[in-house]
Regions:
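CN hydrolase (nitrilase-like) catalytic-core segments centered on the catalytic cysteine
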Residues: 156-172, 189-200, 207, 289, ...
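N-terminal, active-site-proximal structural segment of metallo-dependent hydrolase catalytic domains
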Residues: 19-85, 92-96, 102
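Beta-strand-turn-beta hairpins that frame and shape the catalytic cleft
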Residues: 21-27, 35, 244-246, 279-291
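Extracellular, repeat-based ectodomains that mediate carbohydrate processing or recognition
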Residues: 478-890
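Bacterial N-terminal signal peptides that target proteins for export
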Residues: 1-7
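Short beta-strand scaffold segments in enzyme catalytic cores
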Residues: 216-220, 281, 370-374, 458
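Cys-nucleophile CN-hydrolase/nitrilase-fold catalytic domain and related Cys-dependent amidase chemistry
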Residues: 68, 72-222, 226, 321-322, ...
Length: 890
């Protein structure tokens, strides 16, 4: 094997401890895979080594002309480079490896995937039989992947292990495989002889799968060649040295595409195993707190919310996207922008998304995309369209740090007079030739010819914070039109910056109650602050629970208030920092925030995690709903379901599952629910949640007529039927006429942005009105010149004859909080207005929630103006019910 000169600093070959804030040079490698690179183990290794180093001998035989590398941008070649580097390779970087060697010769001659994969069964028959006996009952194609274990680890694992060591960098790369161990011939010569590639008869070891679950897996290699994995308690281990010799992957893909799924959902697919959402963990490393979202996982709301809750700040998105510029009925870069790009904007703590996109044809299956490094949007002008500020067929945006090229530049760069439709039509004309154009002159050719896909390497230096301070302070202020000055609820931070997250609010009379969770030691604790003067100022925050400070992880508190009493619920982790077992807790307080009694446990089982509890009062009785993982699905995976309970006497009614109905076959392993909302009154309890039963995220609703003891039929609220819709975070409000108002974050029609949508039920939730967009972000929108923006996290409140709404909105660049009202029961909404007072500042305002009391709308949100996340609030006069007293002064 060819090697470059030794790394100058030997210390780079060991895993350094987690460091303070500093720059990391991040690379996205979007290579083109070719059958020629999988003839021998050396061919595959040479391809990857040539991508890493432009000085690799005969590089032009493996890499397209003009493609950058990694090595020339590392120390000592670049003395100005940061000391740490992270290199991300695409999803399916190990797919072609199944063709390696004499056993893959027949498969390499095929012209389709359906010809190539079955051609491997005969040459791998002995290994197939071994795993059939060891793991009976597995789908045939999954057993084939098990039979391929030695080939895959010999090629993929050893290549990237050695490249990480050689270059002293962190490398993330992805293949379809099960966890494995290396077996030495001295230990078990017969097993090694059985599993070892016959092309290497003198090799003194082989790799054996130790699980039947061959899965789409990302491996994060440290500079010493070890794979970094989580211990489930927030600590990062090295594999195999700290995992009993088993080589484990860092992250397993949870939400499989149809072609990846096993029967009966898909009979001609890869039959991969599903990862558990609960097992997707953040890796704390010197290059950031890494979270990996493999392709479809980047769009999944529960996956991303969990990573946010676990403190991720660097998102790795290995991709094998199926098309890019082939069709105009849905624009693939727009669909792609819904995922990792949008989530970096949505979650203020996320600093960067590294998207490495595979290109090239795998027989008749094609992959294409533009690798990119994505940061946070700003209020700055992105400037004219360029190769560096948009994917093809899109308008310029400020979120791009680096973008790989496509086979042709966007024609709008050279001719700004072109409409968006004209630009996309020209791009599609070029893109179709990748599928049906004339043959390319060779396999590395780029351009408008069959399989002329472009590969690329892009990089950027990114400052990664350690600790709660994530940005520079924002001193800019601008008075909103109707809301008063924004004020910090979460109190002074005498011991240094503390990050506060996920605020919620309730109000009753002159009292306003805000709750949130904040980091204390290694875990989060729930806090509450009380205002006794209509939100003018808040008293010192206090712990909610009776747990010792920092002893138990407490997250996502929610609060409800009635005259003379408030109730606060929160989730606890029941096994250290693991989210595999949890509790839902409730505490009651008097109107001044003084605790009444002890903490009470709401859920009735130790099985499974518990997430996102919500509380409301039915009369003077608390009712609660939450996400509960006690139920198991296929592959014994825990599923996220909606459970509810009602306070009774000194305890609670038996927990009852509120969601009902069978999932479609594609969602059988993924019958998950998320982000419940609750409202109650008159003995009725109303729930809404996001639901994946249809292999899309929809908003579903259920009503209980007996105070939460049982629930009726589930009703779908959103009315869009297109594929891969993503609707989340519902909010509910009830009015005196018994109407149910619902709003949610809505992603429909394969558009690149989310909006706030609204529907109303006039029959208690039996059916809902046609959906309509609540926010006005698209008024005056010109698709030829304007860039779509995102609206998230709606919160509804009803008072008198008016419906009020607040939400997170980045129409101005970065996140702000906006507000509107409807005086006619949701038929029309007033023009939206700003809530926060940061004007044109760079800070982020996110996750708002609203409450109404005595003529005032109170909004709380998460705010980074101080450099770390704090809880802020603002208020404005809002319509009061007739005859209900005077409005206090704002």
């Amino acid at each position: 094997m060819w090697t470059r000169s030794l790394i100058a600093v030997a210390a780079m070959l060991v895993v350094a401890p987690a460091a303070q804030a500093g720059d990391v040079r991040m690379f996205a490698v979007g290579h083109k895979h070719r059958v020629q690179d999988a003839v021998t183990y050396a061919d595959y290794r040479n391809k990857m080594a040539a991508l890493m180093d432009a000085g690799f001998p005969n590089r032009s035989a493996y890499v397209q002309a003009g493609v950058d590398d990694v090595a020339s941008h590392l120390r000592p070649a670049d003395p100005r480079a940061p000391r740490r580097a992270l290199v991300v390779f695409p999803e399916e970087a190990g797919l072609i490896n199944i063709l390696i060697g004499s056993r893959g010769e027949t498969s390499r001659r095929q012209t389709s995937v359906l010809g190539a994969v079955p051609s491997l069964f005969a040459p791998y028959a002995r290994q197939f039989d071994h795993y059939t006996a060891k793991y009976p009952g597995q789908p045939a194609v999954r057993l084939l992947f098990l039979a391929l274990t030695d080939t895959l680890y010999r090629s993929f694992y050893e290549t990237f292990r050695d490249l990480a060591r050689e270059h002293g960098v962190y490398i993330a790369s992805t293949m379809n495989a099960a966890p494995a161990r290396r077996v030495e011939a001295a230990e078990d010569p017969d097993l090694v002889a059985l599993l070892r590639d016959p092309d290497e008869p003198d090799r003194g070891y082989a790799y054996e799968a130790v699980s039947p679950h061959a899965a789409n897996t990302t491996y994060v290699f440290a500079p010493n060649g070890e794979v970094l994995v989580s211990d489930g308690q927030g600590r990062t281990l090295q594999s195999p040295s700290q995992t009993a010799g088993v080589i484990r992957g860092s992250t397993v893909k949870a939400y499989l595409t149809p072609s990846e799924q096993p029967p009966p959902a898909e009979f001609l697919g890869l039959a991969l195993a599903f990862g558990a959402v609960q097992d997707m963990e953040v890796l704390d490393t010197p290059v950031g707190r890494l979270a990996t979202v493999i392709s479809k996982d980047a769009w999944m709301i529960d996956v991303n919310d969990r990573f946010e809750a676990k403190g991720a700040n660097v998102i790795l998105q290995p991709e094998a996207f199926s098309d890019w510029g082939f069709r105009t009925d849905e624009w693939a870069p727009d669909v792609f922008k819904e995922g990792g790009f949008a989530n970096v904007q949505k979650y203020p703590a996320w600093q960067v998304n590294v998207d490495a996109s595979l290109t090239g044809a795998f027989f008749n299956t094609v992959f294409d995309g533009q690798s990119a490094i994505i940061g946070r949007r700003t209020k700055a002008d992105p400037g004219p369209l360029s190769p560096d500020n948009a994917w093809i067929g899109q308008n310029p945006d400020t979120g791009f740090l680096a973008v790989g090229p496509w086979i042709e530049p966007d024609p709008g760069i050279a001719d700004p007079s072109l409409s968006l439709a004209q630009r996309r039509q020209q791009l599609t004309t070029a893109g179709l030739k990748l599928l049906i154009g004339p043959p390319c002159p060779d396999s590395l050719a780029v351009g408008q010819c069959r399989n002329g896909y472009r590969e690329s390497i892009v990089w950027e230096d990114v400052r990664i914070p350690r600790g709660p301070v994530t940005a520079r302070p924002d001193r800019v202020r601008g008075a909103p039109p109707a809301f008063g000055r924004s004020a910090r609820v979460s109190g002074k931070e005498k011991q240094g910056p503390v990050a506060q997250h996920a605020p919620r609010v309730a109000a009753q009379g002159r009292y306003v109650y805000a709750v949130w969770h904040e980091q204390r030691g290694h875990v989060s604790n729930a806090f509450m602050a009380v205002s006794r003067n209509h939100g003018r100022h808040f008293h010192k925050p206090a712990r909610v629970s009776a747990n010792a400070a920092g002893a138990v992880a407490e997250m996502f508190p929610s609060v409800a208030a009635i005259d003379g009493e408030i109730a606060v619920t929160w989730q606890e982790l029941a096994a250290g920092r693991s989210d595999e077992r949890g509790r839902v807790m409730l505490a009651r307080f008097d109107e001044k925030g003084r605790k009444r009694g002890g903490d009470a446990r709401v859920d009735d089982t130790d099985e499974g995690g518990k997430w996102l509890p919500q509380v409301a009062y039915d009369g003077r009785t608390p009712v609660l709903a939450w996400i509960d993982e006690r139920d198991r699905g296929p592959q014994d995976l825990p599923l996220e379901h909606v459970y509810a309970a009602r306070a009774v006497g000194g305890g609670f009614t038996p927990n009852v599952r509120a969601d009902a109905g069978a999932p479609v076959p594609l969602a059988a392993h993924l019958d998950n629910k998320w982000s419940p909302a609750i409202a109650a009154g008159g003995g009725k309890v109303y729930l809404a949640w996001a639901d994946f039963r249809n292999y899309n995220w929809d908003i579903f609703f259920a009503r209980s007529d007996d105070g939460g003891r049982t629930f009726g039929a589930n009703v779908k609220v959103d009315d869009f039927t297109g594929f891969e819709r993503i609707d989340e975070r519902p909010s509910l409000a009830l009015d005196p006429l018994g109407r149910v108002h619902a709003a949610w974050t809505d992603l429909r029609a394969r558009e690149p942005d989310t909006n706030i949508f609204y529907a109303r039920s006039d029959n208690g939730g039996a059916s809902f009105s046609p959906n309509r967009q609540l926010d006005d972000s698209k008024q005056g929108f010109d698709p030829d010149t304007d860039t779509p923006t995102n609206q998230w996290h709606p919160s509804l409140a009803w008072a008198g004859e008016t419906l009020f709404a607040a939400w997170q909105d980045n129409r101005l660049g970065n996140n702000d909080v906006f507000f509107t009202s409807s005086p006619d029961g949701g038929a029309t909404f007033a023009p939206s207005e700003r809530v926060d007072d940061t004007g044109s500042g760079h800070s982020e305002q996110s996750r708002p929630q609203m409450a109404w009391a005595e003529g005032l709308c109170h909004v709380v949100w998460e705010d980074t103006r101080s450099g770390n996340a704090d809880v802020f609030t603002a208020r404005r006069p809002c319509a009061a019910p007739p005859g209900k007293g005077k409005k206090p002064k704002p």
